[in-house]
Amino acid sequence: MTQAQRTKIERLSCEKDGITINWRDCTVSHFHFIWLRHQCECAQCGSSLNGVRGLRLDLIPESPKPHKYSFDSDSLHLIWDGDGHASTYEARWLRDHCYSAEERALRKHQPVLWDKQIETDPPTFIFSEVENSSSRRLEMLQAVCDYGFCKVEGAPGLAQEADRLVELVGTKRITHYGDFELSNKKMSDTSDDIATLTEKDSINNVGDIRQALQPHCDETYRMSTIGITIFQVFEPSTEGGHSTLVDGFEAARRFHTEFPDDFEELVRTPLTGQRFDPKHAEGELPRWYRCTLPMIRVDEDQEVCGIRVNERQIAPIDLPYDQVVPTYRALQKFLKIVYDPSLMISFPLTKGDSLIFNNQRVLHGRTAFKLEDPGRQVLTNSVDLEDLYSNLRILRRRLKPEEPLQTYSQGMVT
């Protein structure tokens, strides 16, 4: 069945509470009158796409009805009782917005879950191809959406050019760390402003240590946490420092299968992540962030849509007395799954390599590495999740106009 046939109206009937459409592909859709009246996008009513609407929902009759209707294979036309307002709906638009359970399920993006087996063939792209080809850029963004991560090879090797990759994903997010963060180092005196790793008297950022880091999500202490993280390697470690990744959605799936009651415990129990950050330079102020959310978030279909795992940032648990032990029990079981080697992939990142991942799905870490000169240089930038989705929608509509609009996981958004 072609897309053209899928969006052609074969038959239509006006029922008591709405319109029933029989499509050429034998699918049936039903649209309530109140929904149709509210979704009119004529010049007078306006569109939700730009937020310029003359239509007020509170002024629509509670049970609006048309006194006249007509249709052809490509459109539906209604004249409404009362004010005689005329509404026209394109068949393609109606099919793309059909809210039957079957159509909503078809539009909902389904992530591709993975474990250690993906290590031999992770989704990988070449920077020059992605930068110069909209179709390759779409494939890269789709891979991040599907798998939660991808590698990019041959990316710019200087911090001043790092935005070339970042902007292919979305608008760079600025936090209290500044325009970008060079992890594992102090700023050097070099002209390109790239930092190198040096021994420090005290550690305020876990990225400054050389020991192995267990898989985790970043910044669980923020109410609006990082969506997409982008690592760009300027100087790799020659010994150790391999990146590690875990699919948090697959870990949650196993957790739910093996321990359903404990899974529900972490879905409903709010845990506080916190971070105290002393001032880094003269004139800066210290900061103390705290955010309280569940570790696992599910959507309206009870499917996992967001993960927020960083045991190092869990503040002293503040729950009713009888919830403390069950919560710890659930945490221990979940973290054992998260840290299971059968879920973890590990690979080196060489100079010019980049790693893009969904911080609200994929946990990241690294193996220990040796202190060297020149030191390990890895640039960290981030992009909001909705920016990646925005670019994905625009590219899909331009390059694959026949495909219906997809709905994407909203991560940890409450």
Question: Where is each model-derived feature located?
Answer:
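Active-site environment of non-heme Fe oxygenases that use a 2-His-1-carboxylate facial triad
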Residues: 98, 109-149, 154-155, 159-171, ...
